[in-house]
Amino acid sequence: MGVHSDDWIRQMVKKHRMIEPFEESQVRKKVDGSQVISFGLSSYGYDLRVSREFKIFTNVFNSVVDPKAFDPRSFVEMESDCCIIPPNSFALARSVEYFRIPRDVITICLGKSTYARCGIIVNVTPFEPEWEGYATLEISNTTPLPAKVYAEEGLAQVIFIQASEPCSISYAERNGKYMYQKGVTVPRL
């Protein structure tokens, strides 16, 4: 059991299309030379990008936030080059990359320090064995001020961990509720 390196990630992308699209190295600048929050392959992980699709939490209906009966009207949907998250609120987004996780691997996804140092916290649950889809990203603004997130730039790092043995039942085999998700996905039961 251990954390996989850039060579393993690159090999899994070539053989099994584990990450699509895939950036072979860390990207820090756009073609025009302007800086971006880095994304792409790193030494022991992959820095995923956030897409242009966002759902910003507003609670205009004064709903109780209930994971068993979540009201999707609590979100305002938008597509943009950036997302302004209200103070002490959050947004959902999705990764640019589509992931296919091997049966004997689980991932941990951690927010990039560039955002964390600004009070913007990213939460993503592990990508389980044989899970496949776009990752839904939870982005919290812990500050008393509006916070800006840049689409098509790095948001979080995925670390791939080798299991000591393959699992008995994979996420796909138990028909996980977030299997093959395409867009920003709100809570499901």
Swiss-Prot record:
Coiled coil (UniProt feature): none
Pfam families: DCD
Protein's UniProt keywords contain Ligase: no
Keyword DNA-binding: no
Pathway given in the UniProt record: Pyrimidine metabolism; dUMP biosynthesis; dUMP from dCTP (dUTP route): step 1/2
Major enzyme class: hydrolase
GO molecular function, one term: nucleotide binding
Binding site for dCTP: K112, S113, T114, Y115, A116, R117, T136, L137, E138, Q157, Y171, Q181
InterPro entries (UniProt xref): dCTP_deaminase, dUTPase-like_sf, dUTPase_trimeric
Known catalytic reactions: dCTP + H2O + H(+) = dUTP + NH4(+)
Highest taxon, organism lineage: Bacteria
Enzyme Commission number(s): 3.5.4.13
Active site: E138 (proton donor/acceptor)
Keyword list, A-Z: Hydrolase, Nucleotide metabolism, Nucleotide-binding
Record GO biological process: dUMP biosynthetic process; dUTP biosynthetic process; nucleobase-containing small molecule interconversion
Family under the similarity heading: Belongs to the dCTP deaminase family.
Subunit-structure text: Homotrimer.
Function summary: Catalyzes the deamination of dCTP to dUTP.
UniProt cross-references to NCBIfam families, sorted A to Z: dCTP_deam
Protein name (database record): dCTP deaminase
Organism: Methylacidiphilum infernorum (isolate V4)
Chain's gene name: dcd
